[in-house]
Amino acid sequence: MRLSAFTVVDGAPLPARPVSDRYADVLGLADAAEAGGLSALWIAEHHFQPGGLCPSPPVLLAACGERTRRLRLGVLVSVLPFHRPIELAEQYAMVDRLTGGRLNLGVGSGYIPLEFEGFGVDPATKRERFDRHLETLLAALDGQEVRAEEPSARPVRLNVLPVQRPHPPIWIAVQRREAIPFVARRGASLALVPYATVANPEELAAEIREFREQLPEGVRAEVAVALHLYAGAQPGLAREALQRYLDARLATQSVFYQEKVQRDPHHADARAIEASGFALLGSPREVADRLRRFAEIGVDEVLGIFDFGGLAASEVQASVRALGDAWRS
Protein backbone atom coordinates (compact mmCIF):
# COMPACT_ATOMS: atom_id res chain seq x y z
CA MET A 1 0.00 0.00 0.00
CA ARG A 2 1.28 3.44 -0.91
CA LEU A 3 1.21 6.50 1.34
CA SER A 4 0.53 9.90 -0.24
CA ALA A 5 -0.52 13.40 0.80
CA PHE A 6 -3.76 15.14 -0.16
CA THR A 7 -4.65 18.80 0.32
CA VAL A 8 -7.79 20.82 -0.32
CA VAL A 9 -5.70 24.00 0.21
CA ASP A 10 -8.04 24.87 3.04
CA GLY A 11 -8.44 28.58 3.79
CA ALA A 12 -10.86 28.08 6.68
CA PRO A 13 -11.31 28.42 9.58
CA LEU A 14 -10.29 31.89 10.66
CA PRO A 15 -7.93 33.53 11.32
CA ALA A 16 -7.42 33.58 7.59
CA ARG A 17 -3.94 33.70 6.11
CA PRO A 18 -2.99 35.32 2.81
CA VAL A 19 -3.76 33.03 -0.11
CA SER A 20 -0.16 33.31 -1.32
CA ASP A 21 0.99 31.91 2.03
CA ARG A 22 -1.29 28.89 1.63
CA TYR A 23 0.17 28.26 -1.82
CA ALA A 24 3.64 28.43 -0.28
CA ASP A 25 2.45 25.89 2.29
CA VAL A 26 1.47 23.50 -0.52
CA LEU A 27 4.89 23.86 -2.14
CA GLY A 28 6.43 23.07 1.23
CA LEU A 29 4.11 20.07 1.53
CA ALA A 30 5.40 18.83 -1.83
CA ASP A 31 8.98 19.19 -0.58
CA ALA A 32 8.15 17.27 2.60
CA ALA A 33 6.33 14.52 0.70
CA GLU A 34 9.29 14.08 -1.62
CA ALA A 35 11.76 14.05 1.28
CA GLY A 36 9.58 11.65 3.27
CA GLY A 37 9.38 9.13 0.46
CA LEU A 38 5.63 9.49 -0.09
CA SER A 39 4.19 8.28 -3.37
CA ALA A 40 2.23 11.35 -4.48
CA LEU A 41 0.76 14.72 -3.63
CA TRP A 42 -2.88 15.20 -4.62
CA ILE A 43 -4.59 18.61 -4.84
CA ALA A 44 -8.33 19.34 -4.83
CA GLU A 45 -10.13 21.78 -7.11
CA HIS A 46 -12.60 24.15 -5.44
CA HIS A 47 -14.20 27.49 -6.23
CA PHE A 48 -15.77 30.54 -4.58
CA GLN A 49 -15.44 29.51 -0.91
CA PRO A 50 -12.65 29.45 1.69
CA GLY A 51 -12.74 25.68 2.16
CA GLY A 52 -10.64 25.26 -0.97
CA LEU A 53 -8.29 27.85 -2.43
CA CYS A 54 -7.13 26.09 -5.61
CA PRO A 55 -9.46 26.85 -8.54
CA SER A 56 -6.77 25.76 -11.04
CA PRO A 57 -4.94 22.58 -10.00
CA PRO A 58 -2.84 22.42 -13.21
CA VAL A 59 -1.08 25.65 -12.19
CA LEU A 60 -0.27 24.48 -8.67
CA LEU A 61 0.67 20.97 -9.80
CA ALA A 62 3.10 22.40 -12.34
CA ALA A 63 4.68 24.52 -9.60
CA CYS A 64 5.03 21.44 -7.39
CA GLY A 65 6.52 19.54 -10.30
CA GLU A 66 9.26 22.13 -10.69
CA ARG A 67 10.38 21.50 -7.07
CA THR A 68 10.25 17.69 -7.12
CA ARG A 69 11.82 14.93 -9.17
CA ARG A 70 10.20 11.67 -8.07
CA LEU A 71 6.87 12.53 -6.44
CA ARG A 72 3.76 11.79 -8.47
CA LEU A 73 1.33 14.71 -8.69
CA GLY A 74 -2.43 14.34 -8.82
CA VAL A 75 -5.64 16.31 -9.00
CA LEU A 76 -8.52 14.99 -6.89
CA VAL A 77 -10.68 15.99 -8.45
CA SER A 78 -11.02 17.94 -11.66
CA VAL A 79 -14.73 18.80 -11.57
CA LEU A 80 -15.69 17.88 -15.12
CA PRO A 81 -19.19 19.45 -15.33
CA PHE A 82 -17.66 22.91 -14.82
CA HIS A 83 -15.12 22.77 -17.67
CA ARG A 84 -14.63 22.48 -21.42
CA PRO A 85 -13.05 19.03 -21.72
CA ILE A 86 -10.75 19.77 -24.67
CA GLU A 87 -9.23 22.69 -22.78
CA LEU A 88 -8.79 20.49 -19.70
CA ALA A 89 -7.06 17.87 -21.82
CA GLU A 90 -4.59 20.47 -23.09
CA GLN A 91 -3.83 21.72 -19.58
CA TYR A 92 -3.26 18.30 -18.05
CA ALA A 93 -1.26 17.07 -21.05
CA MET A 94 1.08 20.01 -20.42
CA VAL A 95 1.37 19.13 -16.72
CA ASP A 96 2.24 15.54 -17.60
CA ARG A 97 4.89 16.80 -20.04
CA LEU A 98 6.35 19.32 -17.60
CA THR A 99 6.60 16.71 -14.84
CA GLY A 100 8.05 13.95 -16.99
CA GLY A 101 4.97 11.74 -16.86
CA ARG A 102 4.12 12.03 -13.15
CA LEU A 103 0.47 13.10 -13.38
CA ASN A 104 -2.42 11.25 -11.72
CA LEU A 105 -5.78 12.46 -13.07
CA GLY A 106 -8.69 12.27 -10.65
CA VAL A 107 -12.11 13.37 -11.87
CA GLY A 108 -15.51 13.88 -10.30
CA SER A 109 -18.91 15.43 -10.83
CA GLY A 110 -18.90 18.00 -7.99
CA TYR A 111 -20.98 18.27 -4.84
CA ILE A 112 -20.91 21.82 -3.43
CA PRO A 113 -24.06 23.86 -4.21
CA LEU A 114 -22.27 27.23 -4.35
CA GLU A 115 -19.91 25.98 -7.04
CA PHE A 116 -22.77 24.82 -9.27
CA GLU A 117 -24.56 28.12 -8.72
CA GLY A 118 -21.41 30.11 -9.52
CA PHE A 119 -20.88 28.32 -12.82
CA GLY A 120 -24.58 28.30 -13.67
CA VAL A 121 -24.64 24.50 -13.91
CA ASP A 122 -27.81 22.65 -12.95
CA PRO A 123 -26.81 19.88 -10.48
CA ALA A 124 -29.50 17.68 -12.02
CA THR A 125 -27.40 17.54 -15.19
CA LYS A 126 -24.05 16.78 -13.56
CA ARG A 127 -24.02 13.02 -14.22
CA GLU A 128 -24.80 13.45 -17.91
CA ARG A 129 -22.26 16.28 -18.25
CA PHE A 130 -19.65 14.23 -16.41
CA ASP A 131 -20.10 11.24 -18.72
CA ARG A 132 -19.94 13.36 -21.86
CA HIS A 133 -16.97 15.43 -20.74
CA LEU A 134 -15.00 12.41 -19.54
CA GLU A 135 -15.43 10.69 -22.90
CA THR A 136 -14.13 13.76 -24.73
CA LEU A 137 -11.29 14.31 -22.24
CA LEU A 138 -9.96 10.76 -22.59
CA ALA A 139 -10.30 10.77 -26.36
CA ALA A 140 -8.41 14.06 -26.59
CA LEU A 141 -5.60 12.84 -24.33
CA ASP A 142 -5.34 9.72 -26.49
CA GLY A 143 -4.74 11.84 -29.58
CA GLN A 144 -8.10 11.11 -31.15
CA GLU A 145 -10.07 13.66 -33.13
CA VAL A 146 -12.53 15.49 -30.87
CA ARG A 147 -15.05 18.24 -31.30
CA ALA A 148 -16.22 20.93 -28.89
CA GLU A 149 -19.94 21.18 -28.20
CA GLU A 150 -20.42 24.59 -29.81
CA PRO A 151 -22.25 24.25 -33.17
CA SER A 152 -19.52 26.12 -35.05
CA ALA A 153 -16.67 23.97 -33.69
CA ARG A 154 -14.56 21.91 -36.06
CA PRO A 155 -12.90 18.56 -35.25
CA VAL A 156 -9.37 18.90 -33.84
CA ARG A 157 -6.53 16.87 -32.32
CA LEU A 158 -4.31 18.02 -29.48
CA ASN A 159 -0.85 19.12 -30.57
CA VAL A 160 0.53 18.33 -27.09
CA LEU A 161 -0.11 14.82 -25.77
CA PRO A 162 0.76 13.45 -22.33
CA VAL A 163 3.88 11.38 -21.71
CA GLN A 164 1.77 8.57 -20.23
CA ARG A 165 -0.10 6.70 -22.93
CA PRO A 166 -2.92 6.49 -23.77
CA HIS A 167 -3.46 8.90 -20.87
CA PRO A 168 -2.41 9.39 -17.22
CA PRO A 169 -3.97 7.03 -14.64
CA ILE A 170 -7.65 7.89 -14.14
CA TRP A 171 -9.32 7.96 -10.74
CA ILE A 172 -13.00 8.70 -10.16
CA ALA A 173 -14.07 10.00 -6.74
CA VAL A 174 -17.54 9.25 -5.40
CA GLN A 175 -19.49 10.11 -2.26
CA ARG A 176 -22.40 7.71 -2.67
CA ARG A 177 -22.12 3.94 -2.57
CA GLU A 178 -24.56 3.57 -5.46
CA ALA A 179 -22.00 5.30 -7.71
CA ILE A 180 -19.36 2.61 -7.15
CA PRO A 181 -20.66 0.25 -9.91
CA PHE A 182 -20.43 3.14 -12.39
CA VAL A 183 -16.71 3.54 -11.63
CA ALA A 184 -16.13 -0.21 -11.78
CA ARG A 185 -17.83 -0.58 -15.16
CA ARG A 186 -15.49 2.04 -16.59
CA GLY A 187 -12.47 0.19 -15.26
CA ALA A 188 -11.21 3.35 -13.55
CA SER A 189 -9.62 3.47 -10.12
CA LEU A 190 -11.81 4.53 -7.19
CA ALA A 191 -11.20 7.34 -4.68
CA LEU A 192 -13.20 7.53 -1.44
CA VAL A 193 -13.43 9.88 1.56
CA PRO A 194 -14.70 7.39 4.15
CA TYR A 195 -15.04 9.67 7.17
CA ALA A 196 -17.83 11.51 5.34
CA THR A 197 -19.63 8.46 3.94
CA VAL A 198 -19.26 5.31 6.07
CA ALA A 199 -19.23 4.56 9.79
CA ASN A 200 -16.27 2.21 10.17
CA PRO A 201 -13.57 0.28 8.28
CA GLU A 202 -15.86 -2.74 7.97
CA GLU A 203 -18.30 -0.71 5.86
CA LEU A 204 -15.37 0.60 3.84
CA ALA A 205 -14.16 -2.96 3.26
CA ALA A 206 -17.62 -3.89 1.94
CA GLU A 207 -17.48 -1.00 -0.54
CA ILE A 208 -14.05 -2.09 -1.73
CA ARG A 209 -15.23 -5.69 -2.22
CA GLU A 210 -18.25 -4.45 -4.16
CA PHE A 211 -16.00 -2.38 -6.40
CA ARG A 212 -13.59 -5.21 -7.15
CA GLU A 213 -16.40 -7.71 -7.81
CA GLN A 214 -17.89 -5.44 -10.47
CA LEU A 215 -14.71 -4.67 -12.39
CA PRO A 216 -14.66 -6.04 -15.94
CA GLU A 217 -12.78 -9.32 -16.24
CA GLY A 218 -9.04 -8.80 -16.51
CA VAL A 219 -9.14 -5.14 -15.45
CA ARG A 220 -6.83 -4.05 -12.63
CA ALA A 221 -8.05 -0.90 -10.91
CA GLU A 222 -7.05 0.56 -7.56
CA VAL A 223 -8.71 2.04 -4.48
CA ALA A 224 -7.51 5.16 -2.67
CA VAL A 225 -8.96 6.50 0.57
CA ALA A 226 -8.46 9.90 2.21
CA LEU A 227 -7.69 9.92 5.94
CA HIS A 228 -6.75 12.71 8.32
CA LEU A 229 -3.24 11.96 9.58
CA TYR A 230 -0.99 13.52 12.20
CA ALA A 231 2.30 11.95 13.26
CA GLY A 232 3.96 13.89 16.03
CA ALA A 233 4.15 14.76 19.70
CA GLN A 234 0.96 16.87 19.95
CA PRO A 235 -2.06 14.73 18.98
CA GLY A 236 -4.29 16.88 21.18
CA LEU A 237 -3.40 19.93 19.10
CA ALA A 238 -4.20 17.99 15.94
CA ARG A 239 -7.53 16.82 17.39
CA GLU A 240 -8.55 20.43 18.06
CA ALA A 241 -7.52 21.41 14.53
CA LEU A 242 -9.54 18.55 13.07
CA GLN A 243 -12.66 19.71 14.89
CA ARG A 244 -12.16 23.25 13.56
CA TYR A 245 -11.85 21.82 10.06
CA LEU A 246 -15.01 19.72 10.42
CA ASP A 247 -17.01 22.68 11.76
CA ALA A 248 -15.98 24.81 8.79
CA ARG A 249 -16.66 22.00 6.32
CA LEU A 250 -20.18 21.46 7.59
CA ALA A 251 -21.00 25.09 6.82
CA THR A 252 -19.88 24.93 3.19
CA GLN A 253 -20.23 21.41 1.86
CA SER A 254 -22.88 19.44 0.04
CA VAL A 255 -26.46 18.89 1.09
CA PHE A 256 -25.62 15.17 1.00
CA TYR A 257 -22.91 15.63 3.65
CA GLN A 258 -25.11 17.88 5.79
CA GLU A 259 -27.94 15.34 5.68
CA LYS A 260 -25.48 12.59 6.56
CA VAL A 261 -24.39 14.54 9.65
CA GLN A 262 -28.02 15.10 10.68
CA ARG A 263 -28.62 11.35 10.57
CA ASP A 264 -25.30 10.44 12.17
CA PRO A 265 -23.50 13.34 13.92
CA HIS A 266 -20.27 11.34 14.28
CA HIS A 267 -19.34 12.38 10.72
CA ALA A 268 -18.69 15.90 12.05
CA ASP A 269 -17.11 14.96 15.40
CA ALA A 270 -13.33 14.71 15.53
CA ARG A 271 -13.17 12.24 18.41
CA ALA A 272 -15.81 10.02 16.81
CA ILE A 273 -13.96 10.01 13.48
CA GLU A 274 -10.75 9.17 15.31
CA ALA A 275 -12.51 6.35 17.16
CA SER A 276 -13.87 5.00 13.86
CA GLY A 277 -10.32 4.73 12.52
CA PHE A 278 -10.59 7.37 9.80
CA ALA A 279 -8.42 9.94 11.60
CA LEU A 280 -5.09 8.63 12.85
CA LEU A 281 -3.41 10.97 15.33
CA GLY A 282 -0.39 9.89 17.34
CA SER A 283 3.31 9.16 17.20
CA PRO A 284 4.79 8.27 13.80
CA ARG A 285 5.14 4.60 14.80
CA GLU A 286 1.57 4.41 16.14
CA VAL A 287 0.08 5.96 13.01
CA ALA A 288 2.16 3.80 10.67
CA ASP A 289 1.09 0.64 12.49
CA ARG A 290 -2.60 1.61 12.37
CA LEU A 291 -2.37 2.41 8.68
CA ARG A 292 -1.60 -1.24 7.94
CA ARG A 293 -5.20 -2.15 8.69
CA PHE A 294 -6.22 -0.38 5.49
CA ALA A 295 -3.84 -2.47 3.42
CA GLU A 296 -5.50 -5.55 4.89
CA ILE A 297 -8.96 -4.51 3.62
CA GLY A 298 -7.74 -3.83 0.09
CA VAL A 299 -6.73 -0.15 0.02
CA ASP A 300 -3.97 0.52 -2.51
CA GLU A 301 -3.17 4.12 -1.56
CA VAL A 302 -3.86 6.22 1.52
CA LEU A 303 -4.26 9.92 0.77
CA GLY A 304 -3.16 11.58 3.97
CA ILE A 305 -4.82 14.91 4.77
CA PHE A 306 -2.08 16.45 6.92
CA ASP A 307 -2.78 20.20 6.65
CA PHE A 308 -6.18 20.54 8.31
CA GLY A 309 -7.72 23.12 10.60
CA GLY A 310 -4.96 25.70 10.53
CA LEU A 311 -2.09 23.49 11.72
CA ALA A 312 1.21 25.34 11.29
CA ALA A 313 3.04 24.51 8.08
CA SER A 314 6.14 23.51 10.04
CA GLU A 315 4.09 21.05 12.10
CA VAL A 316 2.46 19.63 8.96
CA GLN A 317 5.75 19.15 7.14
CA ALA A 318 7.40 17.52 10.15
CA SER A 319 4.43 15.15 10.44
CA VAL A 320 4.68 14.19 6.76
CA ARG A 321 8.40 13.48 6.93
CA ALA A 322 8.17 11.57 10.20
CA LEU A 323 5.30 9.38 9.03
CA GLY A 324 7.01 8.73 5.72
CA ASP A 325 10.11 7.53 7.55
CA ALA A 326 8.06 5.33 9.91
CA TRP A 327 6.03 3.88 7.05
CA ARG A 328 9.13 2.81 5.13
CA SER A 329 10.90 1.34 8.18
Where are these regions (language model features)?
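Glycine-rich, proline-tolerant flexible connector loops at the mouths of alpha/beta enzymes
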Residues: 40-64, 79, 194-200, 305-316
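Short, acidic/polar
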Residues: 20-32, 91, 174-181, 284-293
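N-terminal beta1-alpha1-beta2 module of alpha/beta enzyme domains
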Residues: 1-68, 72-73, 168
